[in-house]
Amino acid sequence: MPQLGPMGWEGAELSASEYMLPLGAEQRAEIEAGPEAPGPCIEALAGTMRPRLDHGQGFMLLRGLPRDLPAASVLRALGRHLGTALPAEADPTFCDVLLLRPDAPARLTLLSAASVHNALLLRDKPLLTSLYAASPALGDGIAFQVFGGVFAGYRGPAVPEAAVPETLRTALEAPGLSLSMQGGDVLVLNPFLVWLRDRPEASHLALRASQTRMDFPEWAPPMQSLAAAG
């Protein structure tokens, strides 16, 4: 079945107002105070982001933080309201929430996992079926799953181009959404819904959310060990 709703976006359809959240003075002050300080305004912001990350478009761009703040402190101050931090060596493509703060202004491209899924549904159903049986723990670069009506797509380390079927390559090369990140920006995304085509040099924090896809039956045993091993 096609994956419908806001998670199946196309880059040309989105305007910046749909994914960019300018931070206000109180939110900035709480982040600048560090991850141990009280953060009621950040908790309210996280409450806005959670549904978008879990079953919406799958990402938000936070803008307005000073670029000279320590990246690790910024990410922890935000992340503690969105989930439980995974070990630093955990696989950043297998988590419920990934926070990225580029080391310098950067351009990157986001892809909707649901849109890739739907493109394969139209053009190559046998391939899509095989990706539902794929095992990320065995090195498969792309895998899909639906459990309890909840969709998840996994895109791990790159596979050799020669090994990628043409229909999948075409879907992965779709325009997507090109983002221009400024100094201080933080990208918050759900890697099970949104894939990075090219990841810039960036500080990151991977999180497990309370409503997690990491425990989906077909992925949980092997992938939890993979996340722990990095």
Regions found by a protein language model. Name each.
Residues 1-42, 55-60, 64-67, 82-230:
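Active-site environment of non-heme Fe oxygenases that use a 2-His-1-carboxylate facial triad
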Residues 74-79, 168:
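Short amphipathic C-terminal alpha-helix that caps PH/PH-like domains
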Residues 43-48:
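Short alpha-helical segments and helix-capping/turn motifs at coil-helix boundaries
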Residues 49-54:
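Short, flexible, solvent-exposed loop/turn segments with mixed acidic/basic and small polar residues
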